[in-house]
Amino acid sequence: MIYLDNSATSFPKPEMVYTYMCDFYRNHGVSPGRSGFDAAIETEEVVFGTRKLLTEFFNGDDPNRLTFSYNASDSLNMIIQGLAEPGDHVITTCLEHNSVLRPLHHLELSGMIEVTYLPFDARGYIDPDDVRKAIRKNTKMAVINHCSNVIGTIQPIREIGAICREAGVFLVLDSTQSAGAIPIDIKALNVDVIVFTGHKCLMGPTGIGGSYVCDHVPVRYTRFGGTGVRSAQKTHLEEFPYRLECGTLNLLGVAGLKAGVRWVLDQGIETLHRGEMRLWNKLTQGLRDIDNITLYCADSDKNHNPVLSLNVRGLDSGDVGIMLDVDHSIACRTGLQCAPKVHEVIGTDKIHGTVRLSIGPFNTDADIDAAIAAMEEIASIRR
């Protein structure tokens, strides 16, 4: 199989991720922070070590403000619902994933908040000045996608963050597609909350994600339960990480995430991104010359991730995906990619979305050559 669905989940994982997860679960797979025996202490060291590693990765200050969840969707739900209050105004964009759109829409339908959805330009970018113009006196937060999972554009977060910071608006950054793909410094970007997932560019397993919440952000807890400490207290704990965590963590996921981040750092984020974008350029250039293929991407690889959406004239994207799989053993994603507003803007919502090819660190030139040849064959059906 040629795997070109890395924007959904990176695959395969680095060998050290498999090895570390297996060793961890065989030798340290017990609950942390609940007991004083050696294995429990060692497990807690892995958990805190991963908090510390990711805090440094994003240039945060306090590892306890780094909390774990199931994935980015889970954390976005907690952050959005934990910050929003009746009468608030929230800014977001038409580039967002349903992990942002649906929690906001739920609160909007209830009458609790108002939401402004900012458009993106023909190249796929948000204009920071549109953010400035959208801010009201009651704007609580802006929830913005760092990188589109459909068209791959990386947004000008530093400029957007500066505008939000000046206006006293919290910037919540969805780094699902960017964490591990490009360097992220939340201080330099003026980010107040960053949400991430482990199973994409951080090269970890599924079922693990989280957020880093800066200490000036008054997010409330929205879940209640066991924390392993101060069990006699009737109310949920206010301090981090317990404020956003309850119950036993996905310890195997935490361990795998730790190994994945280590691998990314060992390889070098810029080195990985440069290699993937070289293949993206090759793929894009190869497909531009084929009749009946429409590409949905920026005209330059600057501020771009290795994600390419396309369509074949006269063919449903799902049918193209089936042909790629059955006839060419190429795995990709088709449809709306859980980002319906993107497709409304680029005009693909009425034709069942796009075919998305997304490149990862283990793809090769041979993979790209095969993808170009396969698309040329499929496109010839409509010549």
Residue ranges and their predicted role:
Residues 1-383:
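Pyridoxal 5′-phosphate
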